[in-house]
């Protein structure tokens, strides 16, 4: 992500890109997204006449994560339909003597239609207080040392910039005033370190902790595509890994995303809507299920797959081919990648194995240099507890 792009190259090319990334250009959506929405600056494309005029590269080491911390911490994960919270101690999920977590719970909520930011604040504080109560029940003298959180959306320096959880807070001026600083306000209320990161990156961190290794690209195929990455040092890079809106298909006739109006983006190829798009092409008719009921349509395909239906298998094989080529494409940008963590409803059941087998087949034939990549699926325990517990490792104290 960034609001300023500096290019040393032909002036005509830079002028052309400048016109594309303007309020009236063909990339107006991106110009607004990366400019005012994300970085609160106007997006600029700048020409560097000579190599000496180029700024020094700042790829950087990313943002370190300490995995060997001591004391009590709280980790949370905010989704569209539930809030997860976990208690962690001395670098890992805190367990009772019987091996069960001290606290690792899901609490239902419906934040998107809410128009009062106090509602969001209170509901997040509620789960943090529940976690503190669980800690105090074990050790009345204990002190929460830090809080880490993960949430869908774009966050810059702890401020909310783009997040569907707060879509009810409008117009934009009110969003910037009330929603943007919500996590900074929660941190002030607790008076201890609090760090929030994108949920895709925290998913990759959870995978890295489970695998005890770095260089993990996490991909979740659900209602959309979520992505995240931790490098070989297990650092979160601070990149905008919004792979749902990054193109994987450059065919001009590729499916168009309804939000960004871009074509060929990951959300249309690795999600429930990708399955729904392939259903008629596979020759499957579902007159009893509305066309936009993607979860129900996916469930029907999963049932057909379990019953041995060859048409359903074709859908998963097709997504597997997409996936094989896209993995190779992603590996041009994410370096190194030793593990790819795959999760989400689309890869649940027999069909998920077909997707992975087909993807590996594509990689074997087309990209043998990537054969050593390990595809990893988290187990049920990690899915339930891993994300919130990993989030607890985010703050550096």
Predicted regions span which residues?
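Helical "lid/coupling" subdomains associated with nucleotide-phosphate turnover
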Residues: 1, 230-231, 241, 245-262, ...
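Glycine/GP-enriched mid-protein hinge/lid loop-to-helix segment characteristic of carbohydrate kinases
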Residues: 1, 16, 24-30, 59-72, ...
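Short glycine-rich phosphate-binding loop at a beta-alpha junction
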Residues: 2-10, 141-152, 334-346
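Short loop/turn segments at strand-loop or loop-helix junctions that form parts
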Residues: 8-10, 79, 90, 97-102, ...
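A short acidic Gly-Thr/Ser loop motif
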Residues: 9-10, 68-70, 76-82, 219-224, ...
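Glycine-rich phosphate-binding loop and adjoining helix at the ATP-binding site
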Residues: 11-50, 106-129, 142-147, 153-216, ...
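Phosphate/pyrophosphate-binding loops at sites that engage ATP/ADP/AMP, CoA/4′-phosphopantetheine
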Residues: 125-146, 327-339
